[in-house]
Curated annotation (Swiss-Prot):
Disulfides per UniProt: 95-185
Compartments (UniProt record): Cell membrane; Cell projection, Cilium membrane
Any GO BP: positive regulation of MAPK cascade
Major localisation: membrane
Gene3D superfamilies in the record: Rhodopsin 7-helix transmembrane proteins
Organism listed in the record: Xenopus laevis (African clawed frog)
Protein known as: D(1A) dopamine receptor
Amino acid sequence: MTFNITSMDEDVLLTERESSFRVLTGCFLSVLILSTLLGNTLVCAAVIRFRHLRSKVTNFFVISLAVSDLLVAVLVMPWKAVAEIAGFWPFGTFCNIWVAFDIMCSTASILNLCVISVDRYWAISSPFRYERKMTPKVAFIMIGVAWTLSVLISFIPVQLNWHKAKTTSFFDLNITLHDRTMDNCDSSLNRTYAISSSLISFYIPVAIMIVTYTRIYRIAAKQIRRISALERAAVHAKNCQNSTSNRNSLDCQQPESSLKTSFKRETKVLKTLSVIMGVFVCCWLPFFILNCIVPFCDPSLTTSGTEPFCISSTTFDVFVWFGWANSSLNPIIYAFNADFRKAFSNLLGCYRLCPTSNNIIETVSINNNGAVVYSCQQEPKGSIPNECNLVYLIPHAIICPEDEVLKKEDESGLSKSLEKMSPAFSGILDYDADVSLEKINPITQNGQPKT
């Protein structure tokens, strides 16, 4: 009798612990879903509301990414969250459609990240050709290819049952071994589909992203050194001119501050690109490794413990949520540059409460003789540019002299901000809270802006 009472107490305690764990899981997943919805909805609303954001072709890719992540938060995450809390799949035959949505939306998100990396590499490596060739039509074709691939590897195989393994799945056996008689929507993939879909959805895109961002860093670092050399030469010439007039040869020396600035800029670029790739890889790599390994598990050997790669369905689900969490981080990484931050502040009605610092805008003009003329001005807080035909500066243009930038920042009390190099960096290289926007304006032969 005492044994029965003790057993009942243990069962009640386990039930309470399981209920508490499910409540905590539900709260965490709800926060994740809401943050994904809010971030990506803000991105879409900002582009719809402000015309200057729609005028930049590179933002088309950001919008496509936001839409795919928004679909993850609407069509994929809530249904799985309910199943996690309930402990079983309560939606019956909707499982196959949900699996197709899961594969399609996740693949679309990853392929859009890949397209963004290609777009920004093209803008950095061939800026003049990019300005001519990257039209809205080309952008829509690239986006269309990404979404078409996502649909082809999701709905067609799933609806035709090409994706399922013919043998008893490891996860199904795992549920049976634990005496759990519940509806289950953990679809077991066959080996061919698991490997081929993983290649298209992750491994090929991540390889492309690694190559493009590595080359972007090399080009950016090289250009930063060129600009630093021009700055040092200009300051050196100015010092020598002043020392000649003052007859003081000690003032005519190479400045060291520009070298430090160049190193800091390169480090900042490297950190930013590392964050982009690091977040993406950390979120998705564990899942896709398991996605390729699990189909090779032999269910008949799981009881003997001789299968080292077979894992529980709970562990697999944790890494699935890690991948989906990437959709909540993408708006922060790709759409939190100065333009989008100001748009978000205006949409939320907090442009007076949310401090947005003044931006030093470097306007670079090229006259008919090929000479580069530049000027600097500050943009007031909370303002949204009215121009719709902004053309971002290529990385070969000359920026404002360092001492002039520092002088303006001393007057406004702002910290030092680094310059964006091209449209490829418009969404990712937001160096500090204050960023500089660059554009090319055609000017007349005498050096005056064309009206």
